[in-house]
Amino acid sequence: MELRNKKISLDDFMSERFHVLKTWHTGKDVENFEDGVKYQQTIPESKNFARALFEADCNGITLSQPRAGVALIEEHIELLKTLQKDCDLLPTTIDAYTRLNRYEEAAVGIQKSIEAGTSKLNGLPVVNHGVKACRRITESLSKPLQIRHGTPDARLLAEIAMASGFTSYEGGGISYNIPYAKRVTLEKSIRDWQYCDRLIGVYEEHGIRINREPFGPLTGTLIPPFVSHAVAIIEGLLALEQGVKSVTVGYGQVGNIVQDIAAIQSLRELAHEYFRANGYENYELSTVFHQWMGGFPEDESRAFAVISWGAAVAGMAGATKVITKSPHEAYGIPTAEANGQGLRASNQMLNMVRDQKFPPCVEVDREVALIKREVRAVMDKVLELGQGDIAIGTVRAFEAGVLDVPFAPATCNSGKMMPIRDNHGAIRVFDPGSVPLPKDVLTLHHDFIAERAKEEGRIPSFQMIIDDINAVSHSKLIGRP
């Protein structure tokens, strides 16, 4: 089917669904779509993710959510029961094999986990476990549950997850391709994610509201806000076209408080601007702030400082939720206790700043205005390349380098745009590649970088970028020599 941003007809969706469900044997358990609808109708409102976000947004509260997932059902339930004591929203992180649709290898990982008595996978293989087993998860917990993964083709995973009672689904055809895959075409990943969004749209038509969350941080490595904003807005538009009504747009912390506050503010405003300009009115919008996604200090005390700083900024920025980290981040997958420690530190900070929203100031206003100019310049070109079709325009924009995600593995990503920190730690553009930023905006970025270069007594270079990538793990924000 030719790629375009048009709602998939129910007949075409059901025809494609027939083939999707045959890609692994557990697909047969969701053949009766009405069974999934009836099961979702039994989920209490208190466990609906979209409802929790809507209420938090209305009340100006920032919710907390960790990342977590292990190979076996009972162990996963035990892990989440431990975490739900300290969080508002629960995750289920999916293993790496499932993300690549390598279900045979996921099955081997399950067996090895059983034999070893500990998880040998870095997440829960939902497709392999199937609906019946996964419903035990949603029935055993009291908080709303979201699937978090990194899957370019997440169609079967979405089918099983929704029929199992999960009420939020993270990802998108760009954000779960460009940072995660190497040789998956954007045409395929965007089209496959249109299926996921249409699935959620069909649930919506049956009165079941399921939240969709594009993955904001992308590669998590010095991402300028305008880059992640553009991707989030595009994926939001694609989701809304397929009938999704609850959208959470995300952003990964960069560490400079002014830029981070401005990013959350501008993200919400720009999303509304583009959604409404494209004719979408009846939707619920929320935001998610991801605590620092780059390298962490090995020392736990320093790691707690990074975590707490992220929580404080998320709260003061007015994000609807914050995705937390753990003090074991530098070492890999955290224990349940370490994950809980990160949550408790975050919650303490969220509670302390709850009544302390960041005050209006000229610096934030200037940064908001700059981000908006950058996003509009990119989005205008994307729409121009697609002749008004955002799906086609996105593919062509990546081909032309108009959309370019720093440090991404995907071959369909140019990788020519290079970011760098300025003298205050904000992310600026060192080399724009083919990204069509206005000349005066590029001059502004050049001047920001020149100020830092003068301070450090060195010429801006790729070495400075490397220093910035490693800086937080070395207990600073800017990669000073």
UniProtKB/Swiss-Prot annotation:
Catalysed conversion reaction: (2S,3S)-3-methyl-L-aspartate = L-glutamate
Top-level taxon of origin: Bacteria
The protein's annotated pathway: Amino-acid degradation; L-glutamate degradation via mesaconate pathway; acetate and pyruvate from L-glutamate: step 1/4
Alphabetized Pfam families for the sequence: Met_asp_mut_E (PF06368)
Keywords tagged on the record: Cobalamin, Cobalt, Isomerase
GO terms for MF: cobalamin binding; methylaspartate mutase activity
Binding positions for L-glutamate per the UniProt entry: 67, 99, 148-149, 170, 176, 180
Residues reported in the UniProt entry to bind adenosylcob(III)alamin: 69, 122, 179, 296, 325, 329, 333
This protein's record includes keyword Heme: no
GO biological process terms on file: anaerobic glutamate catabolic process; glutamate catabolic process via L-citramalate
UniProt subunit comment: Heterotetramer composed of 2 epsilon subunits (GlmE) and 2 sigma subunits (GlmS). GlmE exists as a homodimer and GlmS as a monomer.
Function noted in UniProt: Catalyzes the carbon skeleton rearrangement of L-glutamate to L-threo-3-methylaspartate ((2S,3S)-3-methylaspartate).
Protein name per UniProt: Glutamate mutase epsilon subunit
Lineage: Bacteria, Pseudomonadati, Pseudomonadota, Gammaproteobacteria, Enterobacterales
Encoding gene per record: glmE
